[in-house]
Amino acid sequence: MEESGYESVLCVKPDVHVYRIPPRATNRGYRAAEWQLDQPSWSGRLRITAKGQMAYIKLEDRTSGELFAQAPVDQFPGTAVESVTDSSRYFVIRIEDGNGRRAFIGIGFGDRGDAFDFNVALQDHFKWVKQQCEFAKQAQNPDQGPKLDLGFKEGQTIKLNIANMKKKEGAAGNPRVRPASTGGLSLLPPPPGGKTSTLIPPPGEQLAVGGSLVQPAVAPSSGGAPVPWPQPNPATADIWGDFTKSTGSTSSQTQPGTGWVQF
């Protein structure tokens, strides 16, 4: 995988101490108790950066940011960064200069939380590097990836509960019948004890009572009891008399030969 052209910052710790460590005589791990912990060789700021697959541990001055030492890390855990066996706050890192010279120094943090963040930052970076390498391999050889086998193995069976399936289908096929709507607006009954008001026609209008047109009696304006309605005339009376008279007078005024029938 090609290295990217920009550098990202993974972790910054403002307080770190550097120690000179004695050479390791055996294959056993480093011990911080063998260092002069009360007399650090240098104190400053630690910064972890990443560029592509590589990570860099940089020891810088707190005020000016001048680089004191740098440790390139190509894998973690590895020889570039090692933990001591007797404490979780101290590590041994391998620093390099521009001329290819290398040296091992000890670093320590005053707070265990800072040491934990230092460790996790390196772990997360190289976990990401591993994932990127796997993705690149899968992109080059997509057929070599694991295939999903959904077939039945020899002798493998499955059980289907058809009874429950039929019940569900029956329940879904019989929707609830909604009551038919009567349509229109429902009229409320009149209030109890109410009286139906009698409509009195305006003066000058005629009402058909018992088959004849009568003129309603008008009560005098002075007030008093209402005048009773007159008795209906016999049914033999011609109820269309006034109507035929009015239509006859109208038809007499109509010019003959127009082709229209008057009603």
Curated annotation (Swiss-Prot):
Q: What does this protein do?
A: Involved in endocytosis.
Composition-biased stretches (Low complexity): 246-263
Q: Which residues carry this modification: Phosphoserine?
A: 181
Transmembrane annotation, as ranges: none
Q: Where is the signal peptide?
A: none
Listed Gene3D superfamilies: Pleckstrin-homology domain (PH domain)/Phosphotyrosine-binding domain (PTB) (2.30.29.30)
- Copy the domain comment: The WXXF motifs mediate binding of accessory proteins to the ear-domain of AP-1, GGAs and AP-2 through hydrophobic interactions. Selective binding to the GAE domains of AP-1 or to the alpha-ear domain of AP-2 is tuned by the acidic context surrounding the motif and the properties of the second residue of the motif itself.
Q: Which compartment or compartments is the protein found in?
A: Cytoplasmic vesicle, Clathrin-coated vesicle membrane; Cell membrane
Q: Which residues does the annotated region (Disordered) include?
A: 166-194, 219-263
Q: Do you know which SUPFAM superfamilies this protein is assigned to? A: PH domain-like (SSF50729)
Supply the source organism for this entry.
Answer: Homo sapiens (Human)
Protein name as catalogued: Adaptin ear-binding coat-associated protein 2
Q: Name one GO biological process term.
A: vesicle-mediated transport
Matching entries from Pfam families are given as: DUF1681
Gene Ontology cellular-component annotations: clathrin vesicle coat; clathrin-coated pit; plasma membrane
